[in-house]
């Protein structure tokens, strides 16, 4: 007798059964060096070379970071973990409330078809205004972070200075 017996009724036409996927959506595992409060160096984008404070890991596998804006002009923003270098410098983020920041907070507003057409007709009139809510949130986070930053001497100057490599610098030998 075989391990699996043939079915009693068999269809005249063979129907291909779809393959079962064995992939599952799992949360990203971050590097051990990426802990909230770590000072990171941004490697790409508008703020490349800036030192920022890591606040939180978001659901879309991005990192929530801030300059603070008052120190080096980097606002609250999402960054891919691939484009940062973690330094050994840490800042306490216990007093910073980051519960309200999630993927929806950073989502772009969807435009209707009519609004899209108007935006395409007059591209020079497009100026993106910053929501007052975002500005207020930035001020609250900055205030809490600056209180912690001031406790460490020269940390404010360190965060305001940008990172770059000079001729002869060997990045694989640098200790961040």
Curated annotation (Swiss-Prot):
Gene designation per UniProt: RPL6B
- Where are the stretches annotated Disordered? 1-22
**What does this chain do?**
Component of the ribosome, a large ribonucleoprotein complex responsible for the synthesis of proteins in the cell. The small ribosomal subunit (SSU) binds messenger RNAs (mRNAs) and translates the encoded message by selecting cognate aminoacyl-transfer RNA (tRNA) molecules. The large subunit (LSU) contains the ribosomal catalytic site termed the peptidyl transferase center (PTC), which catalyzes the formation of peptide bonds, thereby polymerizing the amino acids delivered by tRNAs into a polypeptide chain.
Q: GO CC terms on record? A: cytosol; cytosolic large ribosomal subunit
Its UniProt miscellaneous note says: Present with 38400 molecules/cell in log phase SD medium.
For this protein, the record's SUPFAM superfamilies field holds: Translation proteins SH3-like domain (SSF50104)
An annotated Gene Ontology molecular function:
RNA binding
Q: How does it assemble?
A: Component of the large ribosomal subunit (LSU). Mature yeast ribosomes consist of a small (40S) and a large (60S) subunit. The 40S small subunit contains 1 molecule of ribosomal RNA (18S rRNA) and 33 different proteins (encoded by 57 genes). The large 60S subunit contains 3 rRNA molecules (25S, 5.8S and 5S rRNA) and 46 different proteins (encoded by 81 genes).
Q: Cite a single Pfam family from the UniProt record.
A: Ribosomal_L6e
Q: Which residues carry this modification: Phosphoserine?
A: 12
| UniProt-annotated location(s) | Cytoplasm
Family to which this protein belongs:
Belongs to the eukaryotic ribosomal protein eL6 family.
Crosslink (Glycyl lysine isopeptide (Lys-Gly) (interchain with G-Cter in ubiquitin)) position:
128
Entry protein name: Large ribosomal subunit protein eL6B
Q: What are the UniProt keywords, alphabetically?
A: Cytoplasm, Isopeptide bond, Phosphoprotein, Ribonucleoprotein, Ribosomal protein, Ubl conjugation
GO BP annotation list: cytoplasmic translation; ribosomal large subunit assembly
């Amino acid at each position: 007798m075989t391990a699996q017996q043939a079915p009693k009724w068999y269809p005249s036409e063979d129907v291909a059964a779809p393959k079962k996927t064995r992939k599952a959506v799992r949360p990203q595992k971050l590097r051990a060096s990426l802990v909230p409060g770590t000072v990171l160096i941004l490697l790409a984008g508008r703020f490349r070379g800036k030192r920022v404070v890591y606040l939180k890991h978001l659901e879309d596998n991005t990192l929530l970071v801030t300059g603070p804006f008052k120190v080096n002009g980097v606002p609250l923003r999402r960054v891919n973990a691939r484009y940062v270098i973690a330094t050994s410098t840490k800042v306490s983020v216990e007093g910073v409330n980051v519960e309200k920041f999630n993927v929806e907070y950073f989502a772009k507003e969807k435009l209707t078809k009519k609004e899209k057409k108007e935006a395409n007709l007059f591209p020079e009139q497009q100026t993106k205004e910053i929501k007052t809510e975002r500005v207020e949130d930035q001020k609250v986070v900055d205030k809490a972070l600056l209180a912690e930053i001031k406790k460490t001497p020269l940390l404010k100057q360190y965060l305001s200075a940008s990172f770059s490599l000079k001729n002869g610098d060997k990045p694989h030998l640098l200790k961040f």
